[in-house]
Structure formats: structure tokens, C-alpha cells
Amino acid sequence: MAKQRHSKSRQIQPTPVASGNGVAPKSMSRRQFLGNSAAGLGGALLATTPLGAYAQDLEPFIPAPNSLSNGRSGGINTGKPEKDFIEEMRDYVIAISRWAKSYRSDFAVIAMNGLELTEFLEKTLFDTRGVAEPARNYLRALDAILVEAPFYGFENYGEPTNAEETKYILGYLERLKLEGLQYLAVDYTENRADMNKARAQLKGLDALYYAAPPPGMQLSSLAKVPSTPFGSNPHVIDNIRQANNFAMVLDSSPYGTKDAYVEALAATNYDTLIIDPFHRGTIPLTYDDMKRLRYKKTGTPRVLISYLNIATAETYRYYWKSGWRAGSPDYVSEGNLMARWGQEHHVHYWTREWQSIIFGNESSYLGNIMKLGFDGVLMAGIDEYAWWLDY
């Protein structure tokens, strides 16, 4: 039986590294993003959203669950909208997946954390504690799940994750093995012995493993240990299931220029690269950049996955407008004090207005990511439901 709880965020101190100089960078306009991302890219643009594509319009495959995960007040927080925040997030992710895969069926949809969304807790007549059942529709929408710090770095870089947390994470992954999902694990350590221990514990789960280097949990450089990727190979990698390894670099500011950043990543043999589609959060990658990143150092293709925060508004992104603040527009809430890089606001992620920024038409964030040629998306912010439950 699964123990249900709300996601616990690691205590990351906000540091505005996205700007590289400690101040909020200048916003990139939607037109600039479109122009840069589509440069040199032929073919038809993604169509506008068909009716019923947003999460609010989804017709569920199964009845809504009687879920204990709705929290102590049925998902209602004082002063907050009356919402089942967990089910709203599930519907949102499902809608994103359906829309993306309607244009490219092999587009990989990866959830970052948020393991609690994978199961319902159903009360029964004889067991009021709840019986765990897989959230089938949500799981069908995913190709993979990435978990952070299952063994090292949950609280502080290089320190072992507490045993209870590790057991909790591995318990979910063990139960979900039969669902056919690919697992990716990111630890925060540079100790090779620790990496070997972690990989041994993941062996039965066939998970891809990456140990991010310091500083902290900023994911701002490539790992130096080991010197070559685990399972390095010269093979053609067409999808994430063929990959033996991956690297994850989300803050490129330490590299200086975009060319230096792209060159550093291109000169690796990782089967999969998970990266931000913007250099330093503001300068979009181009089609030419993507062509350079597409091939491993060996010359064979690899998989490129884009990072996308689907549930917090990042103030340095192209979509952020100068007049926005908490409460204006209505779907923007207060600042996220625990953001990985600061400069973020919680949002009403269940609203059509916010979702239309993220996906559903050719000028949406995900629309541009797909036009640029990424093979999939890593969705961050999935565990935002916990903030709304615990507010």
C-alpha cells in the first residue's frame, strides 16, 4: 500500500542565475522567440488548438476518483479556488500530452517529480486508510518520469538523501515498473563511489542515471565525474528508450556565450541531452544550434529534450509582460520563494488563460519547442499542486 503525502520540495535557496548578473534579464518578445526558433525550419506550422484540447475540456476515460490525495479539505484552501489541485494537474498533463502527440506521436512527454500523481488512493468499506491504484490515464500520457535526489542531495549537495525519502521514491518506482515507463534519476553528488552505489540500487529498474556537479542543485554545468558518460556508445539513438545515459543542463549562464554553451554540449557523447531552449533563460536556441546539438561527438544522432516549467510563471521568460504582478492577470499568484532560480510566480495552472501560454497553438511555448525540433519535453512544476494544497 502506498503512503500518500504531499510532495516535499528540497530547500533550494533562490539565486537569480538565469540572468547571469543577479538581475532580471530583459524579456524576449513572442515575435522574437518565433523568429529565432523557426529560423531555417521548413514545413507546416503547428495548427491552432482544436476544440476540447485544454484540460478543462477533457473527457475522462474513467470516472473521477474518490481520492484521499485531495488533502485535508478536499483540495480547498482558505482564500484559494475550490479545486481538486491534484486532479487538475493530472488533466493538464494529459491535455499537453494529447496535443503534442497529435502532431508527433513519438514526442516524449516526461514528468519531473510529482510521483504522487501516478496513483489514486481509494477508500474501501474495509480499509479506510486507502488502497493505491495506478492513475491509468495520467500514466498513459507519460513516456518517462524523472526523479531528483533519490540517493544524494535531497537536502544538501553531496549528502545522502534520508533513508525514508529514498524508500518512498523507490517504492513508487517499483510499483510502477509494470506501467512501461522509462525512469531517469538525477542525484547531486560528484563522488564516484556514491554514484556506483546509487546505480546498483537502480539496476532492477533499468533507470538512466546522471550525477549533477556542483554548485548546489543549479544544474549549470556538465558532470566531470565520470569523465565519460555511463554506458557511452557509438549507436544511433532515435528515442529515449534506446538511450543508455543522459545529461541535464538547465542554466547555461556559466558558459558565457550561446556558442560556447552549444559547443560544450555538442562535444559530448551523451545519448540524451535535457536542456533549456533558451541560453541564460532569454536567448532562444536556433535551428542551426539544434543541428549542432543533434549529433554526439561520435557523429551519431542523439535525443534532445526541452525543459519546460508548466506551472509557474518565470519572470525572465519571453511571455512575461512588464505590468504583470501577483493578481494581475488573475491567474498569476504570489512569488515562489522556493524557486530553483528565483524570479518565479505561482499560477492558476488549471486556467485556460495560463494553459494557452504553455501549449495548444503554434505560438505557445511548447509549440515553439516542437517547431525547433526537440524530441520531447521535460515538464517541471508538476508538483506545484502541493503548494496549493498546503498554502
What are the roles of these predicted feature ranges?
Residues M1-Q32, A44-P50, Y54-Q56:
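N-terminal secretory signal peptides
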Residues L58-Y391:
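Glycan-processing catalytic domains of CAZymes
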Residues S37-L45:
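Sec-dependent signal peptide hydrophobic core
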